[in-house]
């Protein structure tokens, strides 16, 4: 590597709003404040909700379906 052209790589602290503190290496140069992390994000904790409640086709079929009709 060439000397003097790369940014300084140092250890910084990333603090999440849930209280989790992570020490990482970065070129940012200052401590980071995070909104979500792997400890509190709904995808990783398993507390996610299914937001897809059907699309336009499902709504159309529900509105115009005939009760007792064959599919």
Curated annotation (Swiss-Prot):
Listed InterPro entries: Ribosomal_bL28/bL31-like_sf, Ribosomal_bL31, Ribosomal_bL31_A, Ribosomal_bL31_sf
Cofactor binding annotation: Binds 1 zinc ion per subunit.
Endpoints of the signal sequence: none
Binding site for Zn(2+): 16, 18, 37, 40
Job description of the protein: Binds the 23S rRNA.
UniProt keywords, alphabetically: Metal-binding, Ribonucleoprotein, Ribosomal protein, RNA-binding, rRNA-binding, Zinc
KW Ribosomal protein (keyword) present: yes
Lineage: superkingdom: Bacteria
Pfam family, one: Ribosomal_L31
Entry's Gene Ontology molecular function annotations: metal ion binding; rRNA binding; structural constituent of ribosome
GO cellular component: ribonucleoprotein complex; ribosome
PANTHER family the record matches: 50S RIBOSOMAL PROTEIN L31, CHLOROPLASTIC, LARGE RIBOSOMAL SUBUNIT PROTEIN BL31A
Homology family: Belongs to the bacterial ribosomal protein bL31 family. Type A subfamily.
Alphabetized HAMAP family for the sequence: Ribosomal_bL31_1
Subunit structure: Part of the 50S ribosomal subunit.
Species this protein is from: Yersinia pestis
Protein name, per record: Large ribosomal subunit protein bL31
GO biological process terms, semicolon-separated: translation
């Amino acid at each position: 590597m060439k000397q003097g052209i790369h940014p300084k790589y140092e250890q910084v602290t990333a603090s999440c709003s849930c209280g989790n503190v992570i020490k990482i290496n970065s070129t940012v140069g200052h401590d980071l404040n995070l909104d979500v992390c792997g400890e509190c994000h709904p995808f990783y904790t398993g507390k996610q909700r299914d937001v897809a409640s059907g699309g336009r086709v499902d709504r159309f079929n529900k509105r115009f379906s005939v009760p007792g009709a064959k599919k």
